[in-house]
């Protein structure tokens, strides 16, 4: 018996990737953006999600969870992108959520997982991709540090459902260690 480690065989699945050399192969990702209020976290996230040379055209669905989802005008380019580029009717398929609701988030994650499983059963190799953006909720310990919260689930297992996580927080260490350890990228601005 050979002791050599062999790569698994089987179907190789892909997800759309950024044309930017520095971001190729990054998706699905688990990115943390951390810095004080007004430092540019939201603007960087908006640009990553909507610019074609970054992650624009990579996601089939984008979901924004923020207590300021409708009040913060910085999210308007994402709203326009979802409507015009992704052709999503927000009245039928909401993408912006102001109130924290774990059940709604988990339902969206599970639904995307079902879509990916159907694609795999059909034999598709290019899989649908979803981005979940959590802005200004992670500082609440009830949300971030719960045993079975959907944010931790995305950080640990989201890649299996082709889900990316973009987590925006003013306090890096308010983010649960499980989430920090599983991040694939961290952007920091004068953190606390």
Which residues are covered by each model-predicted region?
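N-terminal pre-Walker A segment at the start of P-loop NTPase domains
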Residues: 1-20, 69
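Conserved P-loop NTPase motor cores
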Residues: 17-19, 29-52, 67-69, 99-192
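Residues immediately N-terminal to the Walker A/P-loop in ABC ATPase nucleotide-binding domains
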Residues: 26
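Post-Walker A helix-loop "phosphate-sensing" segment adjacent to the P-loop in P-loop NTPases
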Residues: 50-60
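Conserved Walker A/P-loop ATP-binding site and its immediately adjacent core
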Residues: 61-77
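Short secondary-structure boundary/capping segments
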Residues: 78-82, 184
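Nucleotide-state-sensitive switch-loop elements of NTP-binding domains
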Residues: 81-98
């Amino acid at each position: 018996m050979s002791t050599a480690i062999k790569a698994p065989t089987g179907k190789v699945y892909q997800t759309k990737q950024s044309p930017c050399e520095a971001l190729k192969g990054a998706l699905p990702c688990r990115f943390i953006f951390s810095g004080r209020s007004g430092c540019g976290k939201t603007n960087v996230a908006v640009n990553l999600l909507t610019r074609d040379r970054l992650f624009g055209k990579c996601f089939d669905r984008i979901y924004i969870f923020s207590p300021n989802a409708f009040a913060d005008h910085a999210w308007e380019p994402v709203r326009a992108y979802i409507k015009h580029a992704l052709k999503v009717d927000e009245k039928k398929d909401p993408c912006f959520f102001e109130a924290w609701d774990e059940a709604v988030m988990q339902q969206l994650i599970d639904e995307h997982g079902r879509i990916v499983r159907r694609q795999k059963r059909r034999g598709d190799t290019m899989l649908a991709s979803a981005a979940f953006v959590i802005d200004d909720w992670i500082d609440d310990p009830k949300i971030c540090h719960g045993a079975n919260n959907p944010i931790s689930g995305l950080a640990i297992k989201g890649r299996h459902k082709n889900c990316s996580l973009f987590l925006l927080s003013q306090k890096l260490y308010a983010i649960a260690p499980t989430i920090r350890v599983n991040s694939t990228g961290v952007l920091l601005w004068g953190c606390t």
